[in-house]
């Protein structure tokens, strides 16, 4: 039981980092599209 908790926390951290990475890529894509269209 004690070993499953850190593993679950690591999975949650990986999910949050993945979501932040996707959000960052989305923002960069929008900024680049605005730059090229302008």
From Swiss-Prot:
The lineage's top-level taxon is Eukaryota
Q: Which InterPro entries match?
A: PSII_PsbL (IPR003372), PSII_PsbL_sf (IPR037266)
Q: Which UniProt keywords apply?
A: Chloroplast, Membrane, Photosynthesis, Photosystem II, Plastid, Reaction center, Thylakoid, Transmembrane, Transmembrane helix
Q: Does the keyword Thylakoid apply?
A: yes
GO terms for CC? Answer: chloroplast thylakoid membrane; photosystem II reaction center
Q: Which Pfam families match?
A: PsbL
Query: One GO BP annotation here?
Result: photosynthesis
Record keyword ATP-binding present: no
Mark the transmembrane ranges.
17-37
The listed locations are: Plastid, Chloroplast thylakoid membrane
Q: Which family does it belong to?
A: Belongs to the PsbL family.
Instruction: Quote the subunit structure annotation.
Output: PSII is composed of 1 copy each of membrane proteins PsbA, PsbB, PsbC, PsbD, PsbE, PsbF, PsbH, PsbI, PsbJ, PsbK, PsbL, PsbM, PsbT, PsbX, PsbY, PsbZ, Psb30/Ycf12, at least 3 peripheral proteins of the oxygen-evolving complex and a large number of cofactors. It forms dimeric complexes.
* Purpose: One of the components of the core complex of photosystem II (PSII). PSII is a light-driven water:plastoquinone oxidoreductase that uses light energy to abstract electrons from H(2)O, generating O(2) and a proton gradient subsequently used for ATP formation. It consists of a core antenna complex that captures photons, and an electron transfer chain that converts photonic excitation into a charge separation. This subunit is found at the monomer-monomer interface and is required for correct PSII assembly and/or dimerization.
Kindly provide the name given to this protein in its UniProt entry: Photosystem II reaction center protein L
């Amino acid at each position: 039981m004690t070993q499953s908790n850190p593993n679950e926390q690591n999975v949650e951290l990986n999910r949050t980092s993945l979501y932040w990475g996707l959000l960052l890529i989305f923002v960069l894509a929008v900024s680049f599209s605005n730059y090229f269209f302008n």
